């Protein structure tokens, strides 16, 4: 089981993204091996915002967001008031943006690795949870393909 952030999903969904290859490879592994994935509900909003800024294509973005929400094995976790308080503490301690602290807090509370391509999370997240790029996760978890 893993936690994913918006940067992972954007890389997986946009073929022109510099990290698309490994993000797509991980997404295929998730599907084939039925790896459970969790993400906070804010991921939907962040993915939509990032995609529209990069593509300027509202229809394509809406389709991508629907595709994200229908991913098998993906559980979207709502943000409660106690969770928000915990994430605020992580934001303060790490100097991360609020949304980034939400992903990190979810990974910390669940005891799971956070898969991200976000440099700030990669640089500042380690004291709170295991933080890996898709490339690192794939390297640490070789597939069983023949």
Give names to the regions the model predicted.
Residues 46-77:
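Active-site-proximal, substrate-binding regions of enzyme catalytic domains
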Residues 1-39, 54-63, 137-145:
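Short, well-structured N-terminal submotif of metal-dependent ribonuclease cores
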Residues 11-13, 50, 124-125:
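Residues that scaffold the ATP/ADP-binding catalytic core of kinase and kinase-like folds
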Residues 4, 38-39, 78, 98, ...:
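Short beta-strand scaffold positions
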Residues 15, 41, 66-92:
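Acidic catalytic patch
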Residues 1, 76-77, 104, 108-146:
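Acidic, PIN/NYN-like endoribonuclease modules and their adjacent C-terminal/linker elements
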Residues 8, 43-44, 83, 102-103, ...:
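Alpha-helix capping/helix-boundary segments
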């Amino acid at each position: 089981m893993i936690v994913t952030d918006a940067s992972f999903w954007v890389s997986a969904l946009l073929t022109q993204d510099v990290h698309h290859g490994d993000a797509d490879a991980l997404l295929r592994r998730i599907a084939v091996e039925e790896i459970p994935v969790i993400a906070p509900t804010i991921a939907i909003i962040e993915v939509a915002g990032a995609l529209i800024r990069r593509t300027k294509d509202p229809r394509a973005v809406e389709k991508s967001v629907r595709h994200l929400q229908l991913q098998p094995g993906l559980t979207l976790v709502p943000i409660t008031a106690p969770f928000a308080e915990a994430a605020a503490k992580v934001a303060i301690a790490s100097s991360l943006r609020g949304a980034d602290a939400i992903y990190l807090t979810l990974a910390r509370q669940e005891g799971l690795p956070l898969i991200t391509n976000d440099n700030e999370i990669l640089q500042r997240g380690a004291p709170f949870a295991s933080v890996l790029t898709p490339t690192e996760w794939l390297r640490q978890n070789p597939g069983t393909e023949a």
